[in-house]
Each structure stands twice: as structure tokens, then as C-alpha cells.
Swiss-Prot record:
Organism: Mycobacterium sp. (strain JLS)
Protein name: Large ribosomal subunit protein bL33B
Sequence similarity: Belongs to the bacterial ribosomal protein bL33 family.
Gene that produces this protein: rpmG2
SUPFAM superfamilies, sorted: Zn-binding ribosomal proteins
A GO BP entry: translation
């Protein structure tokens, strides 16, 4: 398998509605569903949930 098939690059968009995004890689075998991570959003200056965007 190619490297990009196993660990594709995904965008994480803030659920606070600010439009702020993080870019990361995810492992499809361990996380077949959409990723949901709690990270810092500098626009609202607090930690919020970031959800994988397709």
C-alpha cells in the first residue's frame, strides 16, 4: 500500500464557526470514522472541538 492510502492528510475545522483549520494525518485503520479532536482556536481564544472535513 502507498503511504498516502494508509495515512491521508485531513483538515480539521473548528466547530466554533470561526473557519480556523488544522491540517494533520490520520490512520484509517485505527480511525475509520471522522476525527474529532479538542484543540486551541486562537480566534475565540479557547479550546474547542475540531472535526474532520471531507
Amino acid at each position: 500500500m502507498a503511504r498516502n492510502e494508509i495515512r491521508p492528510i485531513v483538515k480539521l475545522r473548528s466547530t466554533a464557526g470561526t473557519g480556523y483549520t488544522y491540517v494533520t494525518r490520520k490512520n484509517r485503520r485505527n480511525d475509520p470514522d471522522r476525527l474529532m479532536l479538542k484543540k486551541y482556536d486562537p480566534v475565540v481564544r479557547r479550546h474547542v472541538d475540531f472535526r474532520e472535513e471531507r
